[in-house]
Amino acid sequence: MAGNVKKAKAEIATIDVCLVTIETADGEFGFDTANSIAVEPQIEEQDAVKLVVKGILRAQKPKEVTLTGNEITLTDNVFNPELVLVLQGGTIKYDTQEPTKIIGYTPPVAGSSDKGEVFKLNAYSAQYDASGQIVQYEKITYPNCQGVPVAFGSEDGAFRAPEYTINSAPKTGEAPYEINYVPELPVLGA
């Protein structure tokens, strides 16, 4: 006779990149134009050690794998100078007549110590139920993120979709990410 097996308490189906927010020392800003976030765990491995005597395995120590952080690839559908400023540093140029209008961006000079800011990245995805209704949002927070220098390409007949590479590494005693469920998305304001 089969034993009683418990059913999982939660079966959470999430979809879409609904919102991405960046938390810096100056506050939090968000953008809803990203359409892809790929996360690659960064690991360090120590090889397994096996004791084989005359063709017989006598003992073995298994391979050890240590998670050291995550490499995040964020694909956005528009160029966001404020995001790039956080990722790699540099300077945003504003119009003198309209002080909130961005008229340019200059990256840090080659060899500069300007590397952007350390930040938290929050990625929100929607959770739907069987009726097609959003029931809540999944928020994954990655700590201690830093961007890598950004490059741009263009192609005839295609809008540019910049890819940003971000490295996240937890501090000692800190988790590499945290998942929370929230009833609604933060509201983007001016």
Go through each PLM region and give its residues:
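Extended, acidic-biased charged interface segments
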Residues: 114-143, 171
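Mixed-charge, glycine-accented linear interaction segment located at domain edges/termini
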Residues: 136-190
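Short, surface-exposed beta-strand/loop "edge" segments at domain boundaries and coil↔beta transitions
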Residues: 27-30, 81-83, 125-137, 174-177
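Short acidic DE-rich linear segments
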Residues: 2, 104-107, 185-190
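Exposed beta-sheet edge/beta-hairpin loop segments within beta-rich domains
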Residues: 64-65, 108-113, 131-134, 150-161
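Solvent-exposed edge beta-strands and adjacent loop segments
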Residues: 2-89, 144-158
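A general secondary-structure signal for short beta-strands and their flanking turns/coil
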Residues: 15, 67-71, 116-120, 135, ...
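Extracellular-facing segments of soluble proteins and assemblies that are Gly/Ser/Thr-biased and enriched
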Residues: 65-122
